[in-house]
Amino acid sequence: MGSKLTCCLGPSGGLNCDCCRPDVGPCHECEIPETVAATAPASTTAKPAKLDLKAKKAQLMQYLSLPKTPKMLKMSKGLDARSKRWLKIIWRRHGIWPLENIGPTEDVQASAHGGVEENMTSDIEIPEAKHDHRPTEDVQVSAHGGVEENITSDIEISEAKHDHHLVEDLSESLSVCLEDFMTSDLSESLSVSLEDFMTSGLSESLSVSLEDLMTPEMAKERYEDYLCWVKMARSRLNEPISSQVLGLLRL
């Protein structure tokens, strides 16, 4: 009974401070029961100990200053667990590791930034390589095709101009020839010769020679045809030169 210690917080609190434990010596507020019995008045009933707020505050601060062990986070089941698992897989594919396996955040940022730069540079280099490795034959073919098109267009334009000039020269030459040919004297001589050719004597000789071969009705029709031809020739001679040139071009 003499070796037993009592806590400064009192038996009613149900607490024991670190100083009042059996393996630690008594605190300055704890006393041995013999000294307490010597100083305490002789009374049959013991008074309850008062709660010391300072000691309680010191105990709380001591508890808070103790090192805490980190708690492992439990993965939730269901959709959240699957999403976290897929996130880890995606991170591993892209070379991004979670903060648990990597020490400082600067290394993570540097690695992520480096990975992004490498991906961007690779994406830029691939189209540049494709563009550089294009065959030069396409460029040569396109240039050759453009030159050929220009040459053919120039040739077609020159040919069209040449044909147009030829038509103009031909029409001018024809008009000049017809003007020289269809002079007034020539037209008069032609009309006179036609009149002399279609005289009554010629018609009589024709009729006499054809009487043995055809009937009078056929001879009459043939004579009318000749008269129509003569009228048409005279009308053509009286027409202007431009209409005569157009008639010749139509033929």
UniProtKB/Swiss-Prot annotation:
Protein name per Swiss-Prot or TrEMBL: Uncharacterized protein C22orf42
**Protein source organism:** Homo sapiens (Human)
Gene name tied to this protein: C22orf42
